[in-house]
Swiss-Prot record:
Name by which UniProt lists this protein: Alpha-conotoxin SrIA/SrIB
Post-translational modifications reported in the UniProt record: Occurs in 2 forms which differ in the post-translational modification of Glu-60. In form SrA1 Glu-60 is 4-carboxyglutamate while in form SrA2 Glu-60 is unmodified.
Swiss-Prot/TrEMBL keywords: Acetylcholine receptor inhibiting toxin, Amidation, Disulfide bond, Gamma-carboxyglutamic acid, Hydroxylation, Ion channel impairing toxin, Neurotoxin, Postsynaptic neurotoxin, Secreted, Signal, Toxin
Signal peptide stretch: 1-21
InterPro entries referenced in this protein's UniProt entry, alphabetically: Conotoxin_a-typ (IPR009958), Conotoxin_a-typ_CS (IPR018072)
Species this chain originates from: Conus spurius
Record-listed 4-carboxyglutamate modification sites: E60, E63
Modified residues (Glycine amide): G66
UniProt-recorded Gene Ontology molecular function terms: acetylcholine receptor inhibitor activity; ion channel regulator activity; toxin activity
Length: 69
């Protein structure tokens, strides 16, 4: 193969890798959003349980435990 042909093959490989990487990142990002939502929900639930089990915290943040101010 000549130098020009090798350079063309190199460019095609780089382009193909870029396209595959870009589409994989988009799919990965949407999965990350769902995972981050689950983690946020778990953190909120843990904080709520911890706070509601302590009287001083429950009085300070009644909206977490279903109470009103």
């Amino acid at each position: 193969m000549g130098m020009r042909m090798m350079f063309t093959v190199f460019l095609l490989v780089v382009l193909a890798t870029t396209v595959v990487s870009f589409t994989s990142d988009s799919a990965f990002d949407s999965r990350n959003v769902a995972a981050n939502d689950k983690v946020s929900d778990m953190i909120a639930l843990t904080a709520r349980r911890t706070c509601c089990s302590r009287p001083t915290c429950r009085m300070e943040y009644p909206e977490l435990c279903g109470g009103r101010r």
